[in-house]
UniProtKB/Swiss-Prot annotation:
It comes from Salmonella arizonae (strain ATCC BAA-731 / CDC346-86 / RSK2980). Pfam families: Aconitase. It is an enzyme of class 4 (lyase). The keyword Nucleus does not apply. The lineage of its organism: Bacteria, Pseudomonadati, Pseudomonadota, Gammaproteobacteria, Enterobacterales. The keyword Iron-sulfur applies. This is 3-isopropylmalate dehydratase large subunit. It catalyses: (2R,3S)-3-isopropylmalate = (2S)-2-isopropylmalate.
Length: 466
């Protein structure tokens, strides 16, 4: 029987399945950070259980860390406690930890792929909703809750029901300046923020194949923002070339053998999906969100929509509420909207390719008066590579702040945040109310679009920035 990639990955990891019961899956990799793990380790301790597979468990500090100093106290008392608990728990249970002083420290969904912890064909979980990022490698990766974190630590397994399947095909070739972030925002604009609910999404088509691994990670990272359980891209030569030689990747003949298996990880001809969505890449323009969920998104050349234009009463009410929170008026061109802050970073867009794209725009320009612009590399290795390429100097000369690795302004859990009423062009993944700080107004954009907003002081079409 012909199978989708998701069905192959799921079936290959079923440990036990009884009639009328939820299947039990084996978990190949468990990624851990400081926010969702303390109670899970406490549960192990209370029941005198060890971590079953410490060699398949990797921890880092990211959500709470300051990006201005490596002082564990800088982000407040709760952050300090969570980071100290992670140190204690990893030491006690034998889990490898990339702490603030480790050269590999960084955002968990940046660290995993760059260290070769993430490999095609794996099941990967983390107590973090954007674990879908790792699906870019043809791995079944999804976020879990703290009780499930404890279950995986104790058993290396997880009960998981089968999801529906969705195929999202992006045909043709994207125009110059159009990035994976624009593509995925356009997809969510079409499906809505709940369009993928109950599904695992496989992204395919010529425009997807043309993306780098960094671009594919951006794509899968935001699968959750359309309500999907996970996102997938079938592995290919781009994947294999990225993985080869990384710290935890197979070596020598083992790598060659692995590639032969990884080549089978694709949807069979004749396999059927529950839902199919198609977009044409050449029709996608630079995207900017205007509301308070990622599905409220338009082209940078469009005007703010009028809630009255929505036929669905729920969408209309949502648009009215979003515009009131965002302080926007219908009919105003996006390019007339001024910004206060710019954030380039997050598990969506903090990799070297993202920083290069932003630096290309920033080079020879200056951050607009009154705008604060942050560039936060996703990990120690990304920061080191960017500095070796001189990107830090480009940003600093242009007036951007060059920071230490961390989740930073993606979420208000550290000392990088918006003040009430401040408007931010952000390369992160969520524009919910208060996401970047109480009363903060978030617009999601690509790294190049964020840099363009920084130097012009408002949203600008990257295609017109020469």
């Amino acid at each position: 029987m012909a199978k989708t990639l998701y069905e192959k990955l799921f079936d290959a990891h079923v440990v036990f399945e009884a009639p009328n019961e939820t299947p039990l899956l084996y978990i190949d990799r468990h990624l851990v950070h400081e926010v969702t793990s303390p109670q899970a380790f406490d549960g192990l301790r209370a029941h005198h259980r060890p971590v079953r597979q410490p060699g398949k468990t990797f921890a880092t500090m990211d959500h709470n860390v300051s990006t201005q100093t490596k002082d564990i106290n800088a982000s407040g008392e709760m952050a300090r406690i969570q980071m100290q608990e992670l140190i204690k728990n990893c030491n006690e249970f034998g889990v490898e930890l990339y702490d603030l002083n480790h050269p590999y420290q960084g955002i968990v969904h940046v660290m995993g792929p760059e260290q070769g912890v993430t490999l095609p064909g794996m099941t990967i979980v983390c107590g973090d909703s954007h674990t879908a990022t790792h699906g870019a490698f043809g791995a079944l990766a999804f976020g879990i809750g703290t009780s499930e974190v404890e279950h995986v630590l104790a058993t290396q397994t997880l009960k998981q029901g089968r999801a529906k399947t969705m195929k999202i095909e992006v045909t043709g070739n994207a125009a110059p300046g159009i990035t994976a972030k624009d593509i995925v925002l356009a997809i969510i604009g079409k499906t809505g923020s709940a369009g993928g609910t109950g599904h695992v999404v496989e992204f395919c088509g010529d425009a997807i194949r043309a993306l780098s691994m960094e671009g594919r990670m951006t794509l899968c990272n935001m699968a959750i923002e359309m309500g999907a359980k996970a996102g997938l891209v079938a592995p290919d030569e781009t994947t294999f070339n990225y993985v080869k030689g990384r710290l935890h990747a197979p070596k020598g003949s083992d790598f060659d053998d692995a590639v032969e298996y990884w080549k089978t990880l694709k949807t069979d001809d004749g396999a059927t999906f529950d839902t199919v969505v198609t977009l044409r890449a050449e029709e996608i323009a630079p995207q900017v969100t205007w509301g308070t969920n990622p599905g409220q998104v338009i082209s940078v050349t469009d005007i703010i929509p009028d809630p009255a234009s929505f036929s669905d009463p729920v969408e209309r009410a949502s648009a009215e509420k979003a515009l009131a929170y965002m302080g926007l008026q219908p009919g105003v061109p996006l390019t007339d909207v001024a910004i206060d802050k710019v954030f380039i970073g997050s598990c969506t867009n903090s990799r070297i390719e993202d920083l290069r794209a932003a630096a290309e725009v920033a080079k020879g320009r200056k951050v607009a008066p009154g705008v604060q612009a942050l560039v936060v590399p996703g990990s120690g290795p990304v920061k080191a590579q960017a500095e070796a390429e001189g990107l830090d100097k480009i940003f600093i000369e242009a007036g951007f702040e060059w920071r230490l690795p961390g989740c930073s302004m993606c979420l208000a859990m550290n000392n990088d945040r918006l003040n009430p009423g401040e408007r931010c062009a952000s390369t992160s993944n969520r524009n919910f109310e208060g996401r970047q700080g109480r009363g903060g107004r978030t617009h999601l954009v690509s790294p190049a679009m964020a840099a363009a907003a920084a130097v012009t002081g408002r949203f600008a079409d990257i295609r017109s920035i020469k």
